[in-house]
Amino acid sequence: MGLYGQACPSVTSLRMTSELESSLTSMDWLPQLTMRAAIQKSDATQNAHGTGISKKNALLDPNTTLDQEEVQQHKDGKPPYSYASLITFAINSSPKKKMTLSEIYQWICDNFPYYREAGSGWKNSIRHNLSLNKCFLKVPRSKDDPGKGSYWAIDTNPKEDTLPTRPKKRARSVERASTPYSIDSDSLGMECIISGSASPTLAINTVTNKVTLYNADQDGSDSPRSSLNNSLSDQSLASVNLNSVGSVHSYTPVTNHPEPVSQPLTPQQQQQPQYNLPEREKQLLFTEYNFEDLSASFRSLYKSVFEQSLSQQGLMSIPSESSQQSHTSCSYQHSPSSTVTSHPHSNQSSLPNNHSGLSATGSNSVAQVSLSHPQMHPQPSPHTPHRPHGLPQHPQRPQHPAPHPQQHSQLQPPHSQHPPPHQHIQHHPNHQHQTLAHQPPPPPQQVSCNSGVSSDWYATLDMLKESCRIASSVNWSDVDLSQFQGLMESMRQADLKNWSLDQVQFADLCSSLNQFFTQTGLIHSQSNVPQNVCHGAMHPAKPSQHIGAGNLYIDSRQSLPPSVMPPPGYPHIPQALNTPGTTMAGHHGAMNQQHMMPSQAFPMRRPLPPDDIQDDFDWDSIV
């Protein structure tokens, strides 16, 4: 009994504590704060404390009236009633239980002399209470009751107060027409759709700074779309010349090295050849595609082009596409005062017999593109500054018996997979940076310079467009790869190793290319030119000329100062052509750069530079 008696207080205290805590946190009482509950509470208060105190809350009782005794008590001073109570007293004193605003004013002044001399401020308060208080209802006059102003009455059944609700936010449109950071693809000329069975589609996502490539034939899971971890660097993106929409450019692979900022094109640079082929008439679009693994896309394209030929020769078993992603950026280069045409290469089955290796149009042309792999760049810096004077010769490039260090028209092999970060198309030293070059598989000619030698490039978007156009017209089924067994074996080894080639392996690959081109006569070795020299000072070239051998077109670049040297690793493009007027300087100090393009598709003429250097190269010896 004693224990029970002692336990009772503790149990009671615990219950009280729990009730107190729940009352502090519970919100059940909030919806009960309505006008009706307040009126009922006022009635209880009136019954408990008498009529005198409840008069201040007369507003809460629609039937409250004012006694004459109370009027006499507060006749001399300010009455202790709220404005709502005064309105209630006035309306309830009327036999019709309604009054106009002027009648309410008059009743208050008659019963409480204080308001006669209090000014007009209290009248504003009366109007506010009438319009804001839910207990008062505005009653319009009937037609048979002429007069001014509406009546005010007491609402005996006011609407229940509802809990205030937060206003709904307007739903944001999921897709906005344009964002502050979106770039009009039409103005940039970045859209490209490549037609053709095996031609890839390139896409540049300018918002995310990503470059993408995919095979148009592949769809769904077939086309690699994994995210590209290494997007374009800010420097490379900023260097892209977005204003040069109207000119054609050649591709250059981009290694991670700095270079002068791109400059806007001059009107002379914006001249663009007319493409009369039906393949070229299609609009270039690639903003719709957002495929982001460039490395895997190249491997897929490489397989689609060479798998059949290599499988027949027993040279290659293609492994599954590796998800490893290489740092690739898309870039294209623009010559300052001349249109740089991309250098495709002839896909005829027999190279020795057909030396039109650089036919840019027709069904056999290919855009030159190169993969830039971070593994292959010895220099970690994104860009090496461009050297204004003679660049050091690179020992890593023994594979080039370059006939002219100045001949830098790049020959691309049939494998777009060739990872040469070192194959560089000519870079204008004081011109734009070049972001990386994609490479749809070019036909079987490629001379790669310098293994592991990094250099700096940047370019403009138009070069990418032009390469897309050229790649779209290639008929890959006609390419004869039987004479490139050694090259294909090297490519197969590179593909098996996920293109992680060291410098020695890359040098071997380049050397085998060089040996093949030398044996076939495409490269005429010269004793006066060091083999490890891949580029030299560039000099004015002859005006562009049409070449009759295999619908080639020669596009000359404008002269550069002798002190300005092109970036290291710029590959040769010696052309085997027996054409008058085609000039290339054989000496180390000067060169006439010529770009071969089909004459039928590119009817272009350029004025002859005043300081043109005559060519002393024996073209007959090559043919």
Swiss-Prot record:
Tissues where this protein is expressed: Highly expressed in spermatogonia, spermatocytes, and round spermatids within the testis (at protein level).
Biological-process GO terms, alphabetical: cell differentiation; male meiosis I; spermatogenesis
Annotated gene: Foxj3
Entries under PROSITE patterns matching the protein: FORK_HEAD_1, FORK_HEAD_2, FORK_HEAD_3
Chain residues forming the annotated DNA-binding region: 78-173
Annotated InterPro entries: Fork_head_dom (IPR001766), FOXJ2/3-like (IPR045912), TF_fork_head_CS_1 (IPR018122), TF_fork_head_CS_2 (IPR030456), WH-like_DNA-bd_sf (IPR036388), WH_DNA-bd_sf (IPR036390)
An MF annotation (GO) of this entry: sequence-specific double-stranded DNA binding
Loss of function: phenotype: Null mice have an abnormal skeletal muscle fiber type ratio in males as well as defects in muscle regeneration following injury. Male germ-cell-specific conditional knockout results in complete male infertility, early loss of spermatogonia and meiotic arrest in spermatocytes. Spermatocytes show significantly reduced expression meiotic arrest-related genes.
Sorted UniProt keywords: Differentiation, DNA-binding, Meiosis, Nucleus, Phosphoprotein, Spermatogenesis, Transcription, Transcription regulation
Region (Disordered) location: 143-178, 248-275, 316-451
Protein's name according to its UniProt entry: Forkhead box protein J3
Taxonomic path: Eukaryota, Metazoa, Chordata, Craniata, Vertebrata
Compositionally biased spans, kind Polar residues: 347-371
Places the protein is found: Nucleus
Function: Transcriptional activator of MEF2C involved in the regulation of adult muscle fiber type identity and skeletal muscle regeneration. Plays an important role in spermatogenesis. Required for the survival of spermatogonia and participates in spermatocyte meiosis.
Induction per the UniProt record: Increased markedly during skeletal muscle differentiation (at protein level).
Main location: nucleus
Residues bearing the modification Phosphoserine: 223, 297, 490
GO CC term (a single one): nucleus
